[in-house]
């Protein structure tokens, strides 16, 4: 199985990088894990709706360029469906059972994801109504993916 997280912007903080690297290492026995960073669009603090739409569209084009047709895509979105860790693990296991060996998760920038990315996504997932920095979300997502694999394999990590 191939797992990819596409995120807008670069993670610079060593502590986030270290956490993500730890879960990437733990996942090696279950899947090939990859983080893809696409550049964020520079924008001033105050934007009109049209300017926000343009920023999201440009970031969306960069994201879509990194997604292959065969990939099953999860978009992380506030309006996405919330799942428990157990439900998420069951879903990942079912995807593998039905032949989806390439699973991609997309985390947008500060303005969110473009309509084009949301349309391309096979499903939208939410980690709740909290607003989290997208860099932190990469770490949280990596941990949840690892947790899903431990649940699938009956390991004691998930309690």
From Swiss-Prot:
S-adenosyl-L-methionine binds at residues 76, 108. The gene is rlmH. Homodimer. Specifically methylates the pseudouridine at position 1915 (m3Psi1915) in 23S rRNA. GO terms for cellular component: cytoplasm. This is Ribosomal RNA large subunit methyltransferase H. Its EC number is 2.1.1.177. It catalyses: pseudouridine(1915) in 23S rRNA + S-adenosyl-L-methionine = N(3)-methylpseudouridine(1915) in 23S rRNA + S-adenosyl-L-homocysteine + H(+). It is an enzyme of class 2 (transferase). It is found in: Cytoplasm. One of its GO terms (molecular function) is rRNA (pseudouridine-N3-)-methyltransferase activity. InterPro entries: Alpha/beta_knot_MTases, RlmH-like, tRNA_m1G_MTases_N. It comes from the Bacteria. Belongs to the RNA methyltransferase RlmH family. It comes from Limosilactobacillus fermentum (strain NBRC 3956 / LMG 18251). Keywords: Cytoplasm, Methyltransferase, rRNA processing, S-adenosyl-L-methionine, Transferase. The keyword Aminoacyl-tRNA synthetase does not apply.
């Amino acid at each position: 199985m191939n797992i990819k997280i596409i995120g807008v912007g670069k993670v610079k903080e060593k502590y986030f990088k270290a956490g993500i690297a730890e879960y990437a290492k733990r996942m090696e026995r279950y899947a090939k894990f990859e983080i893809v960073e696409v550049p964020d669009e520079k924008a001033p603090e105050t934007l009109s709706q049209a300017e926000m739409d343009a920023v999201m569209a440009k970031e969306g084009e960069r994201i879509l360029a990194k997604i292959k047709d065969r990939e099953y895509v999860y978009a992380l979105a506030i309006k996405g469906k919330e799942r428990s860790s157990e439900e998420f693990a069951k879903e990942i296991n079912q995807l593998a059972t039905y032949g989806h060996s390439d699973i991609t998760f997309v985390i947008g920038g500060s303005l969110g994801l473009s309509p084009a990315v949301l349309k391309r996504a096979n499903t939208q997932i939410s980690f709740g109504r909290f607003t989290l920095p997208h860099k932190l979300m990469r770490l949280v997502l990596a941990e949840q993916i690892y947790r899903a694999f431990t649940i699938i394999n009956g390991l004691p990590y998930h309690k």
